Structures are given as C-alpha cells and as structure tokens.
C-alpha cells in the first residue's frame, strides 16, 4: 500500500497543481462551504459492499474512496429486495455531496423508503414507476429542506437504478452517472445536468436566475441536486421549476436477456475514464471472475492513478447475462502480471542507481506492452508495478509504513 500511495503522489502532482490554479481562478464563484481543499497524500483505504439475490439473479458490488479530498462526501445504498413488492424488484443509488456530506447521507438513508412509498403495492409500468421516482426524489428533497439548518450551503447529486422483472429505471439529477452494458457495448448512458444545457438554462432563466461561467448564478456547477436550497427560493414556482431542481430525469429501459451490468458512479470516476473505457474495463475484470466489490476497488485505483482528485464511489449491478469467468482471460492476466514484474526487475537491475517508482512507471508507460486491460491500460496495473517495485526497494522503515 505504501508504494502504491507514493506512486499516486507522483502521478497526481501535475493534476493537483492544475487544481490549485483552477481554484485560484474560480475562487470568486465557488460554492460557500464547498470542500475543495486537497490532502498532501491520498487516502486510498476503500469501503467495500456487496450482495446477491438468488431468486432474481442480481448481484452487486460497490467501493468508495476518499482520495485526495479533505472530506468524504459520497454515499450509496443498495436494496436487493423491496418490502411489499414481488421478487425481482431492487434499488441502488450513488450520491455525491458538495459543501458537506449531509445531503448525500440523507439521500442514501431515506430515498429507498420514499421510492417504496410512491410505488405502492402494484406499480404501473413503465409510466407510473417513472412518475413515482420523480415524486420520491422531490419528497425526499422537501423533507431534507425541513430538516436543513437555515442558511447552510451544500447539496448532493444522485443517480439511482430501480430494477423490476420487466424494466430497468435509471433516475439521476446532477453529474453522477449510470451506464448500461448490453451485448458487449454501452447501450445507454445518462447525461449530466449542467446549467448550459438548453432545457436547464431555460428553467434557470424563467426562475429569475442566470448562468455565468457555465454555473448557476456563477457558482453551482450542476443544475439539479438534492439540497442547495439557496437556489430554490423563486416565489410562486413549484420545486421542479426552481433554479436548481431535485426532479430527476428518468429513463425506462425494457430488460433484455443480453443485459450485462449497470455501472453507477460519482463524477470523480467519470473525470478519469470515459463510458466506453469503463464498460471495457468492467467487462475484462468480470472475465477474470473477480468479486464485484474488488472489481470496483480496482476501478477506483485506476481512476486515482489517472489523476482523479475527487471522492469516488462506484457500484456495479450484474444481471444473469453478465460476462462469465474465462480460463483463457485468467491465464493471460497472470502472464501479464508476471511480465510486468519481470520488466520492473529488469529496469531496477539495469540502472546505475535505484530508480524511483515514478521513473519505473513512466518508462513502462513509454513501451508498447501487449495485453493491457482495455480502458484502464497500464494505470490499471499500477498496484502490480508498485508491489513488484517494493519487493526490490524495501527499506527498514517501509514495513512500518505498510501498516498505515
């Protein structure tokens, strides 16, 4: 772990420098109370979560990491069964707080209950369920408003998956995203709610607000969120027509046998990898037979190595049609890990002085190495490289550092 953290420190230096510049430029339009400060080293400990439902064939894994941020403001929830509904209904959500974790934690704790209350015992699919999800988000936001300390800033984006035996419902507000992989490719991906999108800009203007620097009132980067009640004060307008709205955009997708998985993630993940890259990386890890929570942990490690500075949470929900473990893929992965370890040893032995870990990584990055994981490339193998390096470059103090 210590070697991996040191590698992240080196690889993240340029990204952190750019972040400081951006903060200086945008200081006058930042959200009050926003937690933009960065740590000297990332906190890489990950919180893992997994579950499975034998009757429906659903299984999920999730992981969350604080990363470079001074505070952890993400939250998530998973309900593999919904009381009062038949087998096969399930609910999952990832929430990304800003200006504090209060809104994200509230949503993770209470949103499933509001969804269940709005669905009732006999949901009408798909239109009735879509409306139930909209109402549940708005009701949760109203209750959050009643409990919110007056004048406090902060809010949370959210992305949710509601599974029924016939449909997949993807509901989101803000820039936490979801994608569906079907037949080996991305079949659907949500679109971020940004103030410059025509529909969002029109609502903001109609509510008496402005969009400056691609932000609501020059400050908030998303146009839909739970919380952010300072932007929900336009008189005479319903909650869904305020400058910032908690009404989610809801897609209803008929289920198919070819459905493989849905990935839900906060924006720190999407900052580092595209939807196609994420789908390819998840697919390749599924073929290795990884437990889903460990798959998510590897994905977040890859994003950290690619320079993401945000809190990150990802959740993978697999359906019966998900890629299965493949002996050939497992053998190739083992051979790749062995080859990378051998290359690290060669670089170490050929240098006049012991090379730094960052030098080793960048040297390998300049080479054409076959068989690297699709989507993640060499960054998804940083832990393997760091482990091989640490075996060659251990110092007396390193053993203690490993326990950090």
Curated annotation (Swiss-Prot):
Entry-linked InterPro entries: PP2C (IPR015655), PP2C_C (IPR012911), PP2C_C_sf (IPR036580), PPM-type-like_dom_sf (IPR036457), PPM-type_phosphatase-like_dom (IPR001932)
Disulfide bond positions: none
Catalyzed reactions per annotation: O-phospho-L-seryl-[protein] + H2O = L-seryl-[protein] + phosphate; O-phospho-L-threonyl-[protein] + H2O = L-threonyl-[protein] + phosphate
Positions that bind Mn(2+) 1: 96-97
Swiss-Prot/TrEMBL keywords: Hydrolase, Magnesium, Manganese, Metal-binding, Protein phosphatase
Entry's cofactor comment: Binds 2 magnesium or manganese ions per subunit.
Requisite cofactors: Mg(2+); Mn(2+)
List of residues binding Mn(2+) 2: 96, 267, 310
UniProt GO MF annotations: magnesium ion binding; manganese ion binding; protein serine/threonine phosphatase activity
A Pfam family: PP2C
Family, similarity comment: Belongs to the PP2C family.
Name of the molecule in the record: Probable protein phosphatase 1N
Gene name, Swiss-Prot/TrEMBL: Ppm1n
């Amino acid at each position: 772990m210590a070697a991996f953290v040191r590698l992240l420190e080196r690889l993240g230096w340029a990204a952190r420098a750019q972040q400081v510049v951006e903060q200086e430029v945008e200081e006058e339009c930042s959200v009050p109370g926003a937690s933009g400060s960065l740590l000297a080293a990332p906190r890489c400990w990950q919180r893992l979560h997994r579950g499975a439902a034998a009757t429906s064939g659903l299984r999920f894994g999730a992981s969350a990491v604080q990363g470079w941020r001074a505070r952890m403001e993400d939250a998530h929830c998973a309900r593999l069964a919904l009381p009062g509904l038949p087998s096969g209904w399930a609910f999952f959500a990832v929430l990304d707080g800003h200006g504090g974790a209060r809104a994200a934690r509230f949503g993770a704790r209470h949103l499933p209950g509001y969804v269940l209350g709005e669905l009732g015992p006999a949901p009408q699919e798909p239109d009735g369920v879509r409306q139930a999800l909209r109402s549940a988000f708005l009701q949760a936001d109203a209750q959050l408003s009643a409990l919110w300390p007056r004048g406090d800033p902060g809010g949370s984006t959210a992305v949710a998956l509601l599974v029924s035996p016939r449909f997949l419902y993807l509901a989101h507000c803000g820039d936490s995203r979801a994608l569906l992989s079907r037949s080996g490719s991305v079949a659907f991906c949500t679109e971020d709610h940004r103030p410059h999108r025509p529909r969002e800009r029109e609502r903001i203007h109609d509510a008496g607000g402005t969009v400056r620097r691609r932000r609501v009132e020059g400050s908030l980067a998303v146009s839909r969120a739970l919380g952010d009640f300072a932007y929900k004060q336009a008189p005479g307008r319903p909650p869904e027509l305020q400058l910032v709205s908690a009404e989610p955009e809801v897609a209803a997708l008929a289920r198919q046998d070819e459905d493989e998985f849905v990935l839900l993630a906060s924006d720190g993940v999407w900052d580092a990898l595209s939807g196609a890259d994420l789908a390819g990386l998840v697919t390749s890890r599924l073929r290795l037979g990884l437990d889903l929570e460990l798959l998510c942990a590897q994905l977040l490690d890859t994003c950290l190595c690619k320079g993401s500075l945000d809190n990150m949470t990802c959740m993978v929900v697999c359906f019966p049609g998900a890629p299965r473990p493949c002996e050939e893929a497992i053998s190739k992965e083992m051979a790749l890990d062995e080859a990378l370890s051998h290359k690290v040893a060669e670089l170490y032995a050929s240098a006049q002085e012991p090379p730094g870990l960052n030098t080793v990584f960048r040297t390998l990055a300049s080479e054409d190495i076959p068989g690297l994981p699709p989507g993640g490339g060499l960054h998804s193998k940083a832990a393997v490289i760091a482990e091989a390096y640490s075996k060659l470059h251990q110092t007396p103090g390193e053993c203690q550092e490993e326990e950090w």
